[in-house]
Every structure is written in structure tokens, then in C-alpha cells.
A protein has these predicted regions:
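Polybasic "coupling" helices that flank or enter modular domains
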Residues: 1-19, 29-35
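Basic, amphipathic alpha-helical hairpins
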Residues: 9-23, 42, 46, 63-72, ...
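Charge-rich, low-complexity intrinsically disordered segments
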Residues: 21-54, 60
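Residues within the alpha-helical elements of helix-turn-helix
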Residues: 30, 79-80, 95
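Key DNA-contact positions within bacterial/archaeal DNA-binding proteins
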Residues: 36, 85-86, 101
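Short hydrophobic/aromatic patch on the recognition helix
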Residues: 38, 87-88, 92
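Terminal helix-turn-helix DNA-binding modules in bacterial transcription factors
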Residues: 44-89, 105-111
């Protein structure tokens, strides 16, 4: 029961902060639990660690921005709290399977 409250609180914090450069440690601290407790709770109830949940939210927004805006990759990475566009592009490619540019190009080709 308590674990579910922590997960819900974490997801709410992710929604509030996914455009900021926050760390898992920061969110765990705000919830009043350790990083290992947060990761254990996330793995148990959501099937993935806290950082992956945070990245999934950022990538969801990135896909939305790639689809509906003409923002550059640099602007997007900055908006989503990445310190470097290279880190954003690397994460996007690793999780989505293609680069942000290729994702946008594919969308344009389908229209």
C-alpha cells in the first residue's frame, strides 16, 4: 500500500519536473525515501527503475515535439533538461531505435 503511494508520488513528481534537469536522488529526497528504496518500488510495481521512468516521460514529450513542432534538436534537448544535445540524441536512439532527426523525417514521409 505504502509502495503504491511512493510510486504515485514519484510519477507525479516526474510529470512536474520532466523538463528540468533533476536527478533520481532529488525526487527520492522529495519523497522522503532513499534512491534504492525508490528504485526497488519502481521495479516492483512498474517493472523498471526510476531513471527509466523519467527517461520514458522525456521521450514521450520529445516524440510529441518532433511530431507537432519545428523545434531543433538543440532546442528540444534544452527544453527537456538535457545538459547536452548529444546526450539527448544518444538516449533517444538507444530507446526508440532511430535518431530524433530520422524519427521526424519518417513522420514527414508518412504524411
Amino acid at each position: 500500500h505504502r509502495a503504491r503511494e511512493y510510486l504515485n508520488g514519484f510519477i507525479q513528481l516526474v510529470e512536474e519536473t520532466y523538463r528540468q534537469h533533476v536527478k533520481v536522488e532529488d525526487l527520492a529526497h522529495r519523497l522522503g525515501i532513499s534512491v534504492s528504496h525508490l528504485n526497488g518500488t519502481c521495479r516492483e510495481l512498474a517493472g523498471q527503475p526510476a531513471l527509466q521512468i523519467m527517461h520514458e516521460r522525456q521521450l514521450l514529450e520529445a516524440k510529441r515535439l518532433l511530431t507537432y513542432t519545428s523545434m531543433t534538436i538543440y532546442e528540444m534537448s534544452e527544453l527537456l533538461g538535457f545538459s547536452d544535445p548529444t546526450n539527448f540524441t544518444r538516449l533517444f536512439r538507444r530507446r526508440v531505435g532511430i535518431s530524433p532527426k530520422a524519427f521526424r523525417d519518417r513522420l514527414k514521409a508518412e504524411q
